[in-house]
Amino acid sequence: KALAEKLHREMSTYRGVDLTENSRMTLGEWLDQWLEELVAPSVRESTLEGYRHHIQYHIKPRLGSKPISKITPDDVRKLYRDVQNHGRIREDPEYGHALSASSIRRLHGVFHLAMDAAVRDNLIARNPTEGVTLPRKTAVPKQILGDAQLERFLDVIREDDVWHDFFYTELTAGLRRGEICGLQWSDFDEAH
């Protein structure tokens, strides 16, 4: 009876789906094709490199040789668990060889897009990344300078015109470093 129910579920999954001959390709072959034919023409080079990194270092070594039609949500969960514990190539002082939750979320974003495209191209009936629980982001408590600490810090850097202006702007405007680095002189109003 359990086998019959499983068979019925599988049949209903594929009902109305006309899988193509390419359904036999491996996940690695699909990811290469997806990157070159569908992604590369429509994204910036830096985005493409980020996608390639996730695929080459995390997805393909673990699942690349498996037929795309055989990838299951359990495979995806195992992938995320494995990279969560052993995904970093070079050891990080804070994380060791583990990937952070936000890195796994970015990896999931890439994998999810690729598998959505496989569904649209009738390579698979459903996206196995759908509904997989992702690790929660760990909130790192922010260290905020007190008034006395802020005054001491500004006293120390006051002697250096470049750094004083940079940090004074950062601390008083509430901007992030990247936003400060992108400022132009035209962004400043000398009167105020």
Where do the protein language model's features map onto the residues?
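Basic, Lys/Arg- and aromatic-enriched nucleic-acid-binding interface segment
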Residues: 89-109, 120-183, 190-191
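Short amphipathic alpha-helical coiled-coil/interface segments
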Residues: 4, 108-111
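Structural motif corresponding to the C-terminal cap of alpha-helices
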Residues: 38, 59, 63, 83-91, ...
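N-terminal DNA-binding module of tyrosine recombinases/phage integrases
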Residues: 1-78
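Short, conserved phosphate-binding/catalytic loop or strand-edge motifs used
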Residues: 69-84, 130-135
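C-terminal flanking helix
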Residues: 56, 112-115, 119
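Short, basic/aromatic-rich helical patch in the C-terminal catalytic core of site-specific tyrosine
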Residues: 76, 111, 115, 180
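Active-site catalytic microenvironments for nucleophilic, acid-base chemistry
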Residues: 6-14, 37, 82, 86, ...
